[in-house]
Amino acid sequence: MEAQRVVDCHVHVFDPQRFPYRPDTFYAPAGQELGTPARLRTVLDAHGVEHALLVGPNSGYGEDNRCLLDTLAAAAGRYRGMAVVANSTSRAELAELRAAGVSGVTVNAALLGVGYYADAGGLLADLAALDMIADVQVVDDQLVELAPLLERSGVRVHVDHCGRPDPGAGLGAAGFRELLRWGASARAVVKLSGCVKVSREPYPHRDLLPFVRALVDAFGPDRCVWGSDWPFLRMPERVDYGPLLTLLAEQVPDADARRRILWDTPVREYGLGGGSAQVAEGQCEHEPGAAPG
Protein backbone atom coordinates (compact mmCIF):
# COMPACT_ATOMS: atom_id res chain seq x y z
CA MET A 1 0.00 0.00 0.00
CA GLU A 2 1.30 3.44 -0.92
CA ALA A 3 2.29 5.58 2.06
CA GLN A 4 -0.01 8.46 2.91
CA ARG A 5 1.47 11.79 1.84
CA VAL A 6 1.25 14.46 4.53
CA VAL A 7 1.29 18.24 4.92
CA ASP A 8 1.59 19.57 8.47
CA CYS A 9 -0.43 22.79 8.45
CA HIS A 10 0.62 24.26 11.79
CA VAL A 11 4.23 24.46 12.94
CA HIS A 12 6.47 27.25 14.22
CA VAL A 13 10.18 27.98 13.84
CA PHE A 14 12.33 29.58 16.54
CA ASP A 15 16.02 30.22 16.01
CA PRO A 16 17.03 32.80 18.62
CA GLN A 17 20.77 32.35 18.04
CA ARG A 18 20.41 33.56 14.45
CA PHE A 19 17.29 35.67 14.90
CA PRO A 20 17.06 37.08 18.45
CA TYR A 21 13.64 37.52 20.00
CA ARG A 22 12.02 40.93 20.23
CA PRO A 23 12.67 42.52 23.63
CA ASP A 24 8.93 43.16 24.06
CA THR A 25 7.89 39.58 23.24
CA PHE A 26 4.87 38.09 24.99
CA TYR A 27 6.84 34.92 25.70
CA ALA A 28 10.37 33.69 24.96
CA PRO A 29 10.40 29.99 23.96
CA ALA A 30 13.40 28.11 25.32
CA GLY A 31 14.70 24.60 25.94
CA GLN A 32 12.44 21.90 24.54
CA GLU A 33 10.26 24.58 22.93
CA LEU A 34 12.97 25.69 20.53
CA GLY A 35 12.23 24.71 16.96
CA THR A 36 15.06 25.64 14.66
CA PRO A 37 14.69 25.03 10.92
CA ALA A 38 17.16 22.15 11.21
CA ARG A 39 15.14 20.50 13.99
CA LEU A 40 11.92 20.96 12.05
CA ARG A 41 13.41 19.35 8.97
CA THR A 42 14.62 16.38 11.04
CA VAL A 43 11.19 15.86 12.63
CA LEU A 44 9.31 16.11 9.34
CA ASP A 45 11.74 13.79 7.55
CA ALA A 46 11.54 11.21 10.36
CA HIS A 47 7.76 11.02 9.97
CA GLY A 48 7.57 11.24 6.19
CA VAL A 49 5.94 14.68 6.17
CA GLU A 50 6.63 16.34 2.82
CA HIS A 51 5.43 19.91 3.39
CA ALA A 52 4.54 22.22 6.25
CA LEU A 53 2.86 25.55 6.91
CA LEU A 54 5.02 27.77 9.12
CA VAL A 55 2.80 29.97 11.27
CA GLY A 56 4.54 33.12 12.43
CA PRO A 57 4.48 33.15 16.23
CA ASN A 58 3.57 36.14 18.37
CA SER A 59 5.80 34.52 20.99
CA GLY A 60 9.40 35.46 20.39
CA TYR A 61 9.06 37.32 17.11
CA GLY A 62 5.69 39.03 16.70
CA GLU A 63 5.80 41.21 13.58
CA ASP A 64 9.49 40.38 12.98
CA ASN A 65 9.16 37.83 10.17
CA ARG A 66 12.86 37.47 9.35
CA CYS A 67 13.19 33.94 10.77
CA LEU A 68 10.06 32.84 8.93
CA LEU A 69 11.14 34.34 5.61
CA ASP A 70 14.68 32.98 5.89
CA THR A 71 13.32 29.49 6.51
CA LEU A 72 10.97 29.76 3.54
CA ALA A 73 13.77 30.95 1.26
CA ALA A 74 16.08 28.10 2.27
CA ALA A 75 13.47 25.36 1.86
CA ALA A 76 13.06 25.48 -1.94
CA GLY A 77 9.26 25.33 -1.91
CA ARG A 78 8.84 22.75 0.86
CA TYR A 79 7.09 25.24 3.14
CA ARG A 80 4.51 27.99 3.02
CA GLY A 81 4.12 30.65 5.69
CA MET A 82 1.66 32.74 7.67
CA ALA A 83 3.18 36.07 8.66
CA VAL A 84 2.41 38.29 11.64
CA VAL A 85 1.83 41.84 10.42
CA ALA A 86 0.46 45.16 11.62
CA ASN A 87 -3.10 46.10 10.68
CA SER A 88 -1.62 49.01 8.71
CA THR A 89 0.38 46.75 6.36
CA SER A 90 -0.09 47.82 2.74
CA ARG A 91 -1.26 45.70 -0.18
CA ALA A 92 2.17 46.09 -1.79
CA GLU A 93 3.84 44.74 1.34
CA LEU A 94 1.43 41.80 1.39
CA ALA A 95 2.21 41.09 -2.26
CA GLU A 96 5.93 41.00 -1.42
CA LEU A 97 5.25 38.48 1.33
CA ARG A 98 3.16 36.38 -1.03
CA ALA A 99 5.99 36.31 -3.57
CA ALA A 100 8.26 35.00 -0.79
CA GLY A 101 5.98 32.02 -0.11
CA VAL A 102 3.65 33.54 2.48
CA SER A 103 0.05 32.38 2.03
CA GLY A 104 -1.57 34.77 4.48
CA VAL A 105 -1.35 36.49 7.85
CA THR A 106 -2.36 35.58 11.36
CA VAL A 107 -5.41 37.01 13.12
CA ASN A 108 -4.69 35.98 16.69
CA ALA A 109 -7.68 37.21 18.64
CA ALA A 110 -7.01 34.52 21.24
CA LEU A 111 -3.90 36.43 22.29
CA LEU A 112 -4.57 40.02 21.26
CA GLY A 113 -8.35 40.22 21.69
CA VAL A 114 -11.06 40.87 19.11
CA GLY A 115 -10.85 44.62 19.65
CA TYR A 116 -7.27 44.66 18.38
CA TYR A 117 -8.62 43.95 14.90
CA ALA A 118 -11.29 46.67 14.89
CA ASP A 119 -9.27 48.65 12.33
CA ALA A 120 -8.18 45.61 10.28
CA GLY A 121 -10.91 45.88 7.65
CA GLY A 122 -8.53 47.32 5.05
CA LEU A 123 -5.92 44.65 5.73
CA LEU A 124 -8.49 41.87 5.36
CA ALA A 125 -9.85 43.39 2.14
CA ASP A 126 -6.33 43.54 0.72
CA LEU A 127 -5.78 39.90 1.67
CA ALA A 128 -8.99 39.03 -0.15
CA ALA A 129 -7.91 40.98 -3.25
CA LEU A 130 -4.61 39.07 -3.29
CA ASP A 131 -6.36 35.73 -2.65
CA MET A 132 -4.44 35.37 0.61
CA ILE A 133 -5.64 33.86 3.86
CA ALA A 134 -6.58 35.15 7.31
CA ASP A 135 -5.25 32.48 9.69
CA VAL A 136 -7.58 32.95 12.64
CA GLN A 137 -7.08 31.81 16.21
CA VAL A 138 -9.91 32.37 18.67
CA VAL A 139 -10.99 31.12 22.09
CA ASP A 140 -14.34 30.79 23.81
CA ASP A 141 -16.99 32.73 21.85
CA GLN A 142 -14.68 35.20 20.09
CA LEU A 143 -15.59 33.94 16.63
CA VAL A 144 -19.15 35.17 17.14
CA GLU A 145 -17.85 38.73 17.55
CA LEU A 146 -15.15 38.46 14.88
CA ALA A 147 -17.30 36.83 12.20
CA PRO A 148 -18.96 39.99 10.77
CA LEU A 149 -15.58 41.62 10.09
CA LEU A 150 -14.27 38.50 8.38
CA GLU A 151 -17.42 38.01 6.33
CA ARG A 152 -17.55 41.63 5.13
CA SER A 153 -14.00 41.43 3.83
CA GLY A 154 -14.54 38.37 1.65
CA VAL A 155 -11.18 36.98 2.81
CA ARG A 156 -10.40 33.28 2.87
CA VAL A 157 -10.45 32.15 6.51
CA HIS A 158 -8.52 29.27 8.07
CA VAL A 159 -9.37 28.61 11.71
CA ASP A 160 -6.64 27.17 13.93
CA HIS A 161 -6.90 24.40 16.49
CA CYS A 162 -10.52 23.34 15.88
CA GLY A 163 -11.55 26.82 17.03
CA ARG A 164 -10.00 26.06 20.46
CA PRO A 165 -13.26 24.77 21.94
CA ASP A 166 -13.72 24.30 25.67
CA PRO A 167 -14.34 20.55 26.05
CA GLY A 168 -16.30 21.24 29.22
CA ALA A 169 -18.72 23.58 27.41
CA GLY A 170 -19.73 20.94 24.89
CA LEU A 171 -20.73 21.14 21.25
CA GLY A 172 -23.46 23.67 22.00
CA ALA A 173 -21.15 26.52 23.03
CA ALA A 174 -21.84 29.66 21.01
CA GLY A 175 -18.32 29.92 19.59
CA PHE A 176 -18.28 26.33 18.40
CA ARG A 177 -21.77 26.64 16.91
CA GLU A 178 -20.52 29.68 14.99
CA LEU A 179 -17.57 27.69 13.69
CA LEU A 180 -19.89 24.92 12.52
CA ARG A 181 -21.93 27.57 10.71
CA TRP A 182 -18.78 28.54 8.83
CA GLY A 183 -18.72 25.00 7.51
CA ALA A 184 -21.28 26.16 4.93
CA SER A 185 -18.89 28.82 3.58
CA ALA A 186 -16.70 27.84 0.65
CA ARG A 187 -14.15 30.40 1.88
CA ALA A 188 -13.52 28.70 5.23
CA VAL A 189 -11.14 25.90 6.21
CA VAL A 190 -10.63 24.46 9.69
CA LYS A 191 -7.39 23.06 11.04
CA LEU A 192 -7.66 19.81 12.97
CA SER A 193 -4.74 20.86 15.14
CA GLY A 194 -3.81 21.87 18.65
CA CYS A 195 -5.11 18.76 20.42
CA VAL A 196 -2.40 19.03 23.07
CA LYS A 197 -3.20 22.71 23.61
CA VAL A 198 -6.99 22.35 23.81
CA SER A 199 -7.64 18.97 25.43
CA ARG A 200 -8.10 18.54 29.17
CA GLU A 201 -7.16 14.87 28.93
CA PRO A 202 -3.87 13.12 28.18
CA TYR A 203 -3.25 11.40 24.86
CA PRO A 204 -5.33 10.27 22.97
CA HIS A 205 -7.34 13.38 23.95
CA ARG A 206 -10.70 11.69 23.62
CA ASP A 207 -12.55 14.70 25.01
CA LEU A 208 -11.91 16.35 21.62
CA LEU A 209 -13.17 13.46 19.52
CA PRO A 210 -16.77 14.73 19.23
CA PHE A 211 -15.51 18.21 18.27
CA VAL A 212 -13.22 16.90 15.54
CA ARG A 213 -15.92 14.67 14.08
CA ALA A 214 -18.49 17.48 14.18
CA LEU A 215 -16.07 19.72 12.27
CA VAL A 216 -15.33 17.10 9.63
CA ASP A 217 -19.08 16.60 9.19
CA ALA A 218 -19.70 20.36 8.89
CA PHE A 219 -16.75 21.32 6.68
CA GLY A 220 -16.13 18.07 4.84
CA PRO A 221 -12.62 16.71 4.24
CA ASP A 222 -12.13 19.09 1.31
CA ARG A 223 -12.07 22.00 3.78
CA CYS A 224 -10.23 20.41 6.69
CA VAL A 225 -6.46 20.22 7.12
CA TRP A 226 -4.27 18.71 9.84
CA GLY A 227 -1.56 20.32 11.95
CA SER A 228 0.68 19.26 14.82
CA ASP A 229 1.43 22.63 16.52
CA TRP A 230 5.11 21.61 16.79
CA PRO A 231 7.24 22.49 18.80
CA PHE A 232 4.42 22.69 21.36
CA LEU A 233 4.86 25.90 23.32
CA ARG A 234 4.13 26.11 27.04
CA MET A 235 3.92 22.35 27.49
CA PRO A 236 5.37 21.09 30.81
CA GLU A 237 7.10 18.16 29.09
CA ARG A 238 8.21 17.12 25.63
CA VAL A 239 5.40 16.11 23.27
CA ASP A 240 5.99 13.33 20.74
CA TYR A 241 5.10 14.17 17.15
CA GLY A 242 4.29 10.70 15.82
CA PRO A 243 1.33 9.84 18.06
CA LEU A 244 -0.46 13.06 17.06
CA LEU A 245 -0.21 12.06 13.42
CA THR A 246 -1.48 8.54 14.04
CA LEU A 247 -4.30 9.92 16.24
CA LEU A 248 -6.01 11.26 13.13
CA ALA A 249 -6.85 7.68 12.12
CA GLU A 250 -9.04 7.41 15.23
CA GLN A 251 -10.55 10.84 14.80
CA VAL A 252 -11.21 10.36 11.06
CA PRO A 253 -11.59 6.61 10.42
CA ASP A 254 -12.31 6.91 6.69
CA ALA A 255 -9.05 6.51 4.73
CA ASP A 256 -10.21 8.58 1.76
CA ALA A 257 -11.23 11.46 4.03
CA ARG A 258 -7.84 11.33 5.77
CA ARG A 259 -6.06 11.42 2.42
CA ARG A 260 -7.90 14.60 1.50
CA ILE A 261 -7.29 16.20 4.91
CA LEU A 262 -3.60 15.30 5.03
CA TRP A 263 -2.72 16.00 1.40
CA ASP A 264 -5.26 17.04 -1.21
CA THR A 265 -6.81 19.94 0.68
CA PRO A 266 -3.60 21.56 1.97
CA VAL A 267 -1.86 21.15 -1.40
CA ARG A 268 -4.76 23.05 -2.99
CA GLU A 269 -5.13 25.68 -0.28
CA TYR A 270 -1.44 26.55 0.03
CA GLY A 271 -0.30 25.94 -3.54
CA LEU A 272 2.08 23.11 -2.66
CA GLY A 273 3.27 20.18 -4.71
CA GLY A 274 2.97 20.93 -8.41
CA GLY A 275 1.91 24.50 -7.65
CA SER A 276 5.07 25.52 -5.80
CA ALA A 277 6.73 27.43 -8.63
CA GLN A 278 3.62 29.44 -9.44
CA VAL A 279 3.08 30.52 -5.84
CA ALA A 280 6.75 31.42 -5.42
CA GLU A 281 6.36 33.75 -8.40
CA GLY A 282 3.45 35.51 -6.71
CA GLN A 283 0.66 33.71 -8.57
CA CYS A 284 -2.19 31.84 -6.93
CA GLU A 285 -4.13 28.70 -7.61
CA HIS A 286 -7.42 30.48 -6.86
CA GLU A 287 -8.58 33.46 -8.86
CA PRO A 288 -8.42 36.60 -6.68
CA GLY A 289 -11.59 36.90 -4.65
CA ALA A 290 -12.87 33.49 -5.68
CA ALA A 291 -14.08 30.98 -3.13
CA PRO A 292 -11.63 28.13 -2.55
CA GLY A 293 -12.56 24.58 -3.23
Language-model-detected regions and their locations in the chain:
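Hydrophobic faces of well-ordered beta-strands that scaffold small-molecule active sites
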Residues: V7-V11, A52-V55, R80-A83, V105-V107, ...
